[in-house]
Amino acid sequence: MKFAIITDVHGNFDALETVLDDIDNREDIDKIYNLGDNIGIGHETNKVLDHIFDRDDMEMIAGNHDEAIMSVVNGTPYPDDLKDKFYEHHRWIAGHLDEEYYEELNQLPRYIEKTICGKKVLFIHYEIANDKLSSSIDEQPFSPIVKDDENEMTQLFADKDADLIIFGHNHRLHMFDDKNKMYFNPGAVGLNNGPHAVYG
């Protein structure tokens, strides 16, 4: 089974379209896993959501921006750690978000667990400690971003029972293998530091 991983589209429709066109043209990808933060930062929210919710080969989870924006939509407490930098922007996104996407966004899970080729695979936007998996976004469940190295990854995801952990959030491509678990971040589709849209 071959699958593709996309994450952190952040409202960048052109980048998303480029990546999905490449995936579709390959004709050897069975499934796409979308690791969240589809909205926020970029302005093409509804075009992005229309494109991803229209596909039947994609499973997705929520990222911190998705949840924070929906907290504005739902009138629930907003996370303090994002207030200074993103609150006004998230209000703008929420004000332009088509109501037809509310239910689907509110129902996105925080993680997906699969067994693929005999290996336990965890898809998650970023580490959330097991005792915070059901905490609301204003309780800041996502762990602080750590340095991209093997030791930091091992400590960060120490509570997770998986052979392969696939995540996004920090927009940087990296892969580490500590002999017990493998950690893979494909980089951000919509906020890559280079001129190309990336996926895994």
Model regions and ranges:
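N-terminal active-site segment of His-dependent metallophosphoesterases
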Residues: 1-58
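Active-site neighborhood of divalent metal-dependent phosphoester bond hydrolases
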Residues: 55-113, 141-158
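Short, glycine/charged-enriched secondary-structure capping and boundary segments
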Residues: 18-21, 47-50, 74-77, 137-138, ...
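Internal, conserved structured core segments that host functional sites
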Residues: 105-141
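Active-site neighborhood of phospho(di)ester-bond hydrolases with catalytic His/Asp-centered motifs
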Residues: 6-7, 32-37, 59-64, 124, ...
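Conserved beta-sheet core of the metallophosphoesterase superfamily
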Residues: 147-200
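Di-metal (Zn2+ and/or Mg2+/Mn2+) metal-binding site signature of metallo-dependent hydrolases
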Residues: 38-48, 65-68, 171-175
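Beta-strand-turn-beta hairpins that frame and shape the catalytic cleft
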Residues: 1-4, 113-122, 178-182
